[in-house]
Structures are given as structure tokens and as C-alpha cells.
């Protein structure tokens, strides 16, 4: 009987102690991380869509045998820059210039690199063309053909492709370019 009473008492005390801990009203705060907020206010005719500001254009995979001569190109891959909240009373047209590391052999092309320590392809660069199929030198000063702005949303269309500068060797062929807008 004593044993049952002792077991019952211990079980009751554990339950009460557990309930006391669970009901602790003292809040606990811990560091959860950092959230970065980025944005920009612009005094311009339009605002660049957030989806257009940072995008990836997948050019695809090609055999080195596709490049048999200097100037050979791959298929053009379309991409666009979307402008929101445009007011054609502020500016009637928009144009884009791209900036990036130029290829050493052909400065009209972006130089390719590898994203990690992988082998980088050689003998090719990336060519950017505007909606009139005019190549855009990645110098930050060669602007695309002007596009007339309409009220609201406007889409500026471009293409990109690989272009041979020499005999191609296999490897990753990536590049980054920034762009600036010109409103007139």
C-alpha cells in the first residue's frame, strides 16, 4: 500500500512540475536572421519591373562542332525588359545599353566565364541584339533602337546567342551584363 501511495505521489508531483514548466509565462526571444529590403525611387518616365531587373537567360547547350568558322552563331534566345507605370508625357521613347566584360577577341561580345571552378569554354562570346536585330556592344554606351512608350506597361524585346570568335573548346559559357535605361 505504501508503495502504491509513493508511486501515486511521485506521479502527481511530476505532473504538477511538468505543468508548471509548460505554463512558464516568461517569453523567450532569439535571433532569427536578417531580411534585406532593396529598391529604388527613380525620376524617370517608367520603372523597370522587378522581374526584369534580375533575370537569367538560358542559352542552352551546343556542340563545339556547331562552330566551324569565326562568326558562326547559335539560335537567338529571346528575353525582355518590362517597364511599368510609363508616362509618355515625361519621355516619348526608351532605349537600353548593356555593360559587361567584353570578349578579348571581339569586343562587340560579352566574354564567357564559368560559374564555379569548372572549365570555361573558349572561342565564343555572347552577342546581344535589339528588336531590330542590331548587335549591342556591351560597353554601356551603345543603346538599342528607341521604342516609343505607351501609357502603362511596355516590353522591350532582345535576343542573345553564342557567336564564334575562334575554334571553340568545351566548357561553361556564362556571362553577366548590367543594363541602363535612356528615356528621351
From Swiss-Prot:
Report the source organism. Salmonella typhi
**Primary role:** Fimbriae (also called pili), polar filaments radiating from the surface of the bacterium to a length of 0.5-1.5 micrometers and numbering 100-300 per cell, enable bacteria to colonize the epithelium of specific host organs.
Which InterPro entries does this UniProt record tie to the protein? Adhesion_dom_fimbrial (IPR000259), Adhesion_dom_fimbrial_sf (IPR036937), Adhesion_dom_sf (IPR008966), Bact_Fimbrial_Adh_Pro (IPR050263)
**Swiss-Prot/TrEMBL keywords:** Disulfide bond, Fimbrium, Signal
Please indicate if the UniProt record lists Ion transport as a keyword. no
Family as reported in the entry's similarity comment: Belongs to the fimbrial protein family.
Q: What PANTHER family does the record point to? A: FIMBRIAL SUBUNIT ELFA-RELATED, FIMBRIN-LIKE PROTEIN FIMI-RELATED
Q: List the disulfide bonds.
A: 46-86
The keyword Nucleus appears for this protein: no
The record's listing under SUPFAM superfamilies reads: Bacterial adhesins
Q: Which Pfam families match?
A: Fimbrial (PF00419)
The name this protein goes by in its record: Type-1 fimbrial protein, A chain
The gene designation is fimA
Signal sequence span is 1-22
Provide one Gene Ontology biological process annotation.
cell adhesion involved in single-species biofilm formation
List the record's Gene Ontology CC terms alphabetically. pilus
Cell location: Fimbrium
Amino acid at each position: 500500500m505504501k508503495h502504491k501511495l509513493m508511486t501515486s505521489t511521485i506521479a502527481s508531483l511530476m505532473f504538477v512540475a511538468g505543468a508548471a514548466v509548460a505554463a512558464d509565462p516568461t517569453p523567450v526571444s532569439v535571433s532569427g536572421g536578417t531580411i534585406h529590403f532593396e529598391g529604388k525611387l527613380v525620376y524617370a518616365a517608367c520603372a523597370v519591373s522587378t522581374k526584369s531587373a534580375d533575370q537569367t537567360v538560358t542559352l542552352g547547350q551546343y556542340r563545339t562542332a556547331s562552330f566551324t568558322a569565326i562568326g558562326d552563331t547559335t539560335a537567338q534566345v529571346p528575353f525582355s525588359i518590362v517597364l511599368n507605370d510609363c508616362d509618355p508625357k515625361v519621355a516619348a521613347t526608351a532605349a537600353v545599353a548593356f555593360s559587361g566584360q567584353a570578349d578579348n577577341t571581339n569586343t562587340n561580345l560579352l566574354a564567357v566565364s564559368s560559374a564555379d571552378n569548372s572549365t570555361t569554354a573558349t572561342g565564343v562570346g555572347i552577342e546581344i541584339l535589339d528588336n531590330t536585330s542590331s548587335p549591342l556592344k556591351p560597353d554601356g554606351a551603345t543603346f538599342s533602337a528607341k521604342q516609343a512608350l505607351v501609357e502603362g506597361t511596355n516590353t522591350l524585346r532582345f535576343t542573345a546567342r553564342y557567336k564564334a570568335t575562334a575554334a571553340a573548346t568545351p566548357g561553361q559559357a556564362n556571362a553577366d551584363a548590367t543594363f541602363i535605361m535612356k528615356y528621351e
